[in-house]
Amino acid sequence: MSEHKIKPVTIQDDKYRFDAFKNGEVLFGKKGRLPAMGWNSWNAFGSGNNEELTKAMADKMIELGLDKYGYIYVVLDDGCYASKRVDGHLASDAEKFPSGFMAMSDYIHSKGLKYGMYNDVGDRLCSGLEVGTVGYEEIDCQDYIKWKIDYIKVDNCYNIWDNATFSCPKNAKYTFAPDIKGIKLVKVSKEGMKSSNLEMGVTKYSISDGKITGERAYIEGGYATGIGTFDGTSPDASPVSELSSEVHFNVNVSEDAEYDLYVDARCRTREGSGGWLQVAVGTSYYYDDLLVDSVDTEICTDKPIRIKLSKGENVIRLMNHRRQENTLTSYAKIQECFEKLAPEKDILFSICEWGKTQPHNWGYKVGDSWRILNDITFQVGSDGDPGTVSWEGAYTTSVTAQYNKAVIMDEFAGLDKGWNDPDMLVIGMNGMTDTMNKTHMTMWCMLNSPLMLGMDLRRVEKNDDIYKIITNEDLIALNQDTLGVQAKRIFTSKGVKPDTTYLRDNDRVDVLAKPLSDGSVALSFINVSLGFREDRISISPELIREYIGGKMKDADNFVNASKYKVKNLWTKEESVVEANEVAEKGFNVSGLAATDNLTLRIIPM
């Protein structure tokens, strides 16, 4: 991938800035959706999906009655397009989809299903096809509207402003600030002349005088480096930590005045060290550009940046949040075009940037869901091969790597925001036992994750083991409950704070609690490990209220119930338990087989 010579768009509106990420303002799209349910071609067929296979999947969805359970989207993933644009427009691969996308849309809609497609905010798709949306947003949205799509998944490969997957490594100049050694301030007199001294003669500040915020940056060799945002495609950083870093200098002045700021910096083009600098005093921005035209140098800049300081204490912020801001802007551009061209259309927008820029912080502004990590598997299937996945494995490619991150991200999800997406379901792929499949389904339902099937549905028959798992109405009801609350982990056998501690050691049992719209609570005991766990765990109504009471329909009614109706959502066994027995024993489990779960719906009576 070649290095781009142009620069990212100038941010004219502060609503796209990092400082606005927590303000709750939705920029584009509709809220109030429950997690999407359907089928996506990628895990089943990779880039080998075609018209015949897609029609067969749509037919099978109806034959199996999956639409009656809520699986309504049929999504064409990567590999469906021609390798290049035709007269500036997207076109179908003539061999794979000879009838074209409109015919595919008509076929899927004729089944009463909804039609989804795929693209990328980069200049290519992840498969390398040179048909990414960047620069073609309005043309592409026109085509998608013409094809009557109901859903779009948008990837993040070949991002021209990030050193993301398949992108130019030198794009790090856009995603990280220069390494900072210090600053110098020169006061500008009212006549426009510069004074070499501030009050008390102090004009220079070394990095030791500053303060690093967040967990990404650190001091090395007298420089602050890593001024930017953690790459969230890796599982190394907790999603509930402060993932972006700035360098702050507190400066006290005796009067309002203008100053020229000189930044003693080192510009590079590698992960953690870049060339793009943002300068603000408080929330007022004064600079947002490459610090020098030629990066990858060891020189310090003598470029003055004019700023205003107010009488008293000022916080000068040196930072680069463009990794997040550029990505938000790219996704927003697509949504803006949809809204401009067809505001009446209801198109579900699935952000697939793999957690790269921490989209749980900004994704709600433009999307209905956002991927939180790299792919759950890179061993996808093909026609005749179901593909392979691991329960646990190296780095990100496993069921538990996705779960371990998503399980502490509940506060970022909701009907007013959207949903954390730990990738598509891998039920039916090689490497998964029946027990794993059940627990995987439980996890995704409790976490309010999108339920997108990723298997060759021709391998499923009514009432076989796979069918019974993916059509478990009691589990689906948790995911689609109208209260729209992701479960919270309220206990873990690791003995740490359960709701926010990022755990990657799978030798444990977790307990998740999910409030439901009828006043009941779903409680799931999950053995995350590959071995039998002997733990005896008891959960009281009071503990449930402590963690999720603020989101329950009526927490006091739940705690003070005289009895409880308890249903096992896998065995379907039901019992009524008196309050005094619950007070003595709690809702409990004694031992769980490897990768197994006990999931209960508890109804106060």
Enumerate the language-model features and the residues they cover:
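Carbohydrate-binding surface patches
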Residues: 444-447, 452-454, 502-553
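Glycan-recognition surfaces
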Residues: 326-332, 336-456
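N-terminal module-boundary/linker segments of secreted carbohydrate-active enzymes
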Residues: 2-51, 336-339, 526
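Aromatic-lined carbohydrate-binding/catalytic grooves of carbohydrate-active enzymes
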Residues: 53-163
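Extracytoplasmic
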Residues: 168-325, 533, 544-563, 586, ...
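Aromatic- and carboxylate-lined catalytic core of secreted/periplasmic carbohydrate-active enzymes
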Residues: 221, 226, 230-237, 411-423, ...
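C-terminal beta-strand-rich structural cap/linker in extracellular carbohydrate-active enzymes
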Residues: 316-317, 579-605
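Structural recognition of the beta-strand scaffold that forms the well-ordered cores
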Residues: 35-41, 70-77, 114-119, 150-155, ...
